[in-house]
């Protein structure tokens, strides 16, 4: 049995260290060595891979010889032109270890990979797995590090240790030209009774540490810093419904969170603070204490959609700058969130959204109404945006092509061009496709080089401003008439109310 093998036999090191080769070199050593095999890479080695490295038995380890913790750690990198996204996978093997190496998904070189995995994929029906002193960065997929659940709550992933890792950057903000979200997590935890401690995460763009339930886990003494170039959704997230929504005995303690460009959330807690707006509450009891939040974090702690006990005490957000309006914008948020933002509230909750017992520190702000989707904040938004010919070219449902203070302009999945103010349509092109644009979308909105604003389906024009040969720029503004097209002399030749 796996547990007996790991218990009674010492680790068996493969001969020497590996200075070159690829995943096949490493996989052969694991496959031939069996349980407890240790594969060590030489210091300063770079291993290019075109497919994932696979653990094959309990107790195996991959590490750098002499266990350095700095830049001399060996690097495993995804090769340009490769279809690989996950670098190391080890589902359901007990006591495996990934230690003292660097993992580079090489997103800039190999490219974003739609549907790609995390740099590290371990977990499953396993116990005692360890990731320690690892640098994981630039994932092609959705996370720098994923400890996956088993899918069976009666036999869960358990007792992992995620220690002293330096993680990031992970992902980018926004969408690509095909409408794919580019963001990624730092640590994605879906494993019970796990210790996540003393990690430093810089530049996560989805969640810094995302806790997928993971009952009994402790998240302690981690440092999470947002990118100075990309928005980050949340530093620590407790918003997902795995384990029937249970966060029983989860402890989030003594972590340091710093916003550079911006974090929407420091610590998000509950079913309704993210974008899901779930109909059921997540459940404790859980403890959030001794955390320090500083810098550009729009809402350091937000709580809504929770039951069965919560303690949030001794957290400090005194170094979050005030007023928030000097560095952030909440004009796309629901009214209760806008009110909390204007009040410069740092710790916020909605009373009816927290059932059963709660112990909240005294500086919590009680919202006037249901606060949902705290991902609505941003850096300060402009009042207008202007595109020249061929600068605006978007696929339907790819996010707003104008994100302004109080207003967004969006090309919808039915090929309708719509301007919304406070979430309500104030203008639309009116041309829609009953069958929709398809998946992948066959619809595009283009402000062409000839000055015509045109929607296309499968290469065929559907709607246009009729300004071909005359238009020079298109400007979207946050007040009526919302969209204007000007000629080379600056004269308005078309807007949403008239054509001249």
Regions found by a protein language model. Give the residues of each.
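Beta-rich ligand-binding surfaces for carbohydrates and other polyanions
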Residues: 380-500
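Right-handed parallel beta-helix
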Residues: 59-65, 94-107, 126-139, 146, ...
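Short glycine/acidic-rich loop motifs that flank beta-strands on beta-rich extracellular proteins
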Residues: 49-52, 71-73, 80-87, 107-118, ...
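Extracellular beta-strand-rich solenoid/capping regions of secreted or surface-exposed proteins
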Residues: 27, 31-34, 46-63, 70-99, ...
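Acidic, glycine- and Ser/Thr-rich low-complexity intrinsically disordered tracts
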Residues: 281, 305-380
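Fungal secretory targeting signals
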Residues: 1-15
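Acidic Gly/Asp/Thr-rich repetitive segments characteristic of extracellular carbohydrate-active
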Residues: 15-42
